[in-house]
Amino acid sequence: MMLRGNLKQVRIEKNPARLRALESAAGEGDPAALALALPGEPPVPAAPAGEDRPADEGGFTIDIKSFLKPGEKTYTQRCRLFVGNLPTDITEDDFKRLFERYGEPSEVFINRDRGFGFIRLESRTLAEIAKAELDGTILKSRPLRIRFATHGAALTVKNLSPVVSNELLEQAFSQFGPVEKAVVVVDDRGRATGKGFVEFAAKPPARKALERCGDGAFLLTTTPRPVIVEPMEQFDDEDGLPEKLMQKTQQYHKEREQPPRFAQPGTFEFEYASRWKALDEMEKQQREQVDRNIREAKEKLEAEMEAARHEHQLMLMRQDLMRRQEELRRLEELRNQELQKRKQIQLRHEEEHRRREEEMIRHREQEELRRQQEGFKPNYMENREQEMRMGDMGPRGAINMGDAFSPAPAGNQGPPAMMGMNMNNRGTIPGPPMGPGPAMGPEGAANMGTPMMPDNGAVHNDRFPQGPPSQMGSPMGSRTGSETPQAPMSGVGPVSGGPGGFGRGSQGANFEGPNKRRRY
C-alpha cells in the first residue's frame, strides 16, 4: 500500500566528512555536534523546484517509491528497527522526528525505563538506510544502537518436497493468518535444500501454525510427506559483533594478550590445537554418517511409500470397481422390478379390460332378456317355427310337429286321438261335428296337429263342410256364438323339403291307419 509518504521528497545526507566530524565531536561533547543529532534541529531545507544544488554538498534528493521492490509488501516485520540506549526523558514525538526523514512510521514503541524502543518503516530499504545513518548517532550524550528487530513471527519449515516453491509455501501457510514472506532456501546451483522459512504479520498466526503442524501432519503435495515446523533461529549475519559493543571483562583482557598467530609444531599449543582439530573431524565424520543414515532411511521410506501408495491405489480401484458393480446390480434389479411392475400393470389392465368386456356382454344379455320379457311378444309364426324345430325326429329324419292337444303321428300311422277327436274332427262326445282336419302331406312331411282356434262363429252341422279346405291357422271346428272370421295366414302349409319317398296326399283322402276310429 502506497501511503502519502511515497510521494514525499526527502533529502538524505551522505557527507562522510561531516559524519567523521560528528563522531569525533561526540567524544569531546561538542555542542554543535550534539545539536545536529537532536531531534529538535530544524530540517534541512529542500532545494527549490528547478534549482540545482551544488554537488559538493554531498546531499541528493530521492523518491521513497524507488525503494520498494516489485511485489514487496510495506510495513512488514522485516522493516522493524530496534533502537537501544535511548535517553530516559525522550518523548514519542521526539522519537518520531528522529526518523521523519525516512518516511511515515506505522509503529512506535518506547520503553523509557529500560531505554529502548521499536519503530517500523515502510520498506526494508528505508530501514536499512535509517540504520546505516543513525546507528551510533549521539543523542543527549548517548550513542544510539540501531539493529533490525528480531522477527518473532518467523518459522522454519523443513522436510520440503523438491517441487515446493515460494508461492506454494505462502499459499499453504496463509490459512493460519497473513503471511508477509515465504522463501524456499536453495543452494548455489538453485536446487532446493528441503528447508524454508515463513514470516507472519503477527505472532498469534505463527503460534497457531506451530501448534497445528506439531500436533498433526501438514502435507503440501500429493506425497504423504509432512513438513516439520520449528521456531526460526534469529542470526545477525549483517552487523555481527562490532568491537565497540564488546564488554571489556577480565576474560576479554586475558584472551587479548597475544595477537593472532599460527601454532608451532611440537609445542604445547600445537598439540592441543591438533586435538581440537581431531575432535572437529570426528564430529564431522559422525555428522556425515548420521546424514548418510538419515538419507538412506528416507530413501527406503520413500520406496516403501511408493509401493504402498501403488497398492493403495489398486485397492481404491478395486473398491471403486466393486462399488460400480454393486451399483450396476442395483440398477439391474431396479430395472427388473420396473419391468415386472409394468408387466403386472399390463396384466391388470388386460384383466380389467376382459372383465369390462364380460360385464358389457352380461349387461347386454340382461338387457336383451329384460327387453324380451317386457316389450317383445313373439307372433304365431315364430311360435310354430320354434315348435317345429323343437319337435321329435320321425323316421327318415322327418319332423313330426303337433300341438299340445294333438301331437302329430309318425310315419304312415294314423293320427292319434286328440282329446277324444278323430281325423274328421268328430269327437266321441255328443255335440256338433267339427270341420275336417288339415290335409295330409306326403310321407315324411310335417303333419300338423289340429288348430285350436275356430274359423268363425257359425256352427257347422254337416260332417264335411262345403268350401275350400282349412289352412293352417284355420278354426278347429264350429263354436256357438258369432265371431269375426280371421283371414288365413299366407305361406302356411305343408312343410316342404322332406325326403323324396313320400308323396303328397290329398286333403280329402281317407287315412287307413291302425289308429283309425270308427265313424258313427
Swiss-Prot record:
GO terms for molecular function: RNA binding. Its main location: nucleus. Keywords: Acetylation, Activator, Biological rhythms, Coiled coil, Cytoplasm, Immunity, Innate immunity, Methylation, Nucleus, Phosphoprotein, Repeat, Repressor, RNA-binding, Transcription, Transcription regulation. Residues 79-151, 153-234 form the RRM domain. Pfam families: NOPS, RRM_1. InterPro entries: NOPS, Nucleotide-bd_a/b_plait_sf, PSP1_RRM1, RBD_domain_sf, RRM_dom. The modification N-acetylmethionine is found at residue 1. It comes from Bos taurus (Bovine). GO terms for cellular component: cytoplasm; nuclear matrix; nuclear speck; nucleolus; nucleus. RNA-binding protein required for the formation of nuclear paraspeckles. Binds to poly(A), poly(G) and poly(U) RNA homopolymers. Regulates, cooperatively with NONO and SFPQ, androgen receptor-mediated gene transcription activity in Sertoli cell line. Regulates the circadian clock by repressing the transcriptional activator activity of the CLOCK-BMAL1 heterodimer. This is Paraspeckle component 1. It is found in: Nucleus speckle; Nucleus, Nucleolus; Nucleus matrix; Cytoplasm. Belongs to the PSPC family. Forms heterodimers with NONO; this involves formation of a coiled coil domain by helices from both proteins. Found in a RNP complex with CAT2 transcribed nuclear RNA (CTN-RNA). Interaction with NONO is required for its targeting to paraspeckles and perinucleolar caps. Interacts with SFPQ. Part of the HDP-RNP complex composed of at least HEXIM1, PRKDC, XRCC5, XRCC6, paraspeckle proteins (SFPQ, NONO, PSPC1, RBM14, and MATR3) and NEAT1 RNA. Interacts with ALKBH5 (when acetylated); interaction with acetylated ALKBH5 facilitates recognition of N(6)-methyladenosine (m6A) RNAs. Residues 494-506 have a biased composition (Gly residues). Disulfide bonds: none annotated. Gene3D superfamilies: 3.30.70.330, 6.10.250.1170.
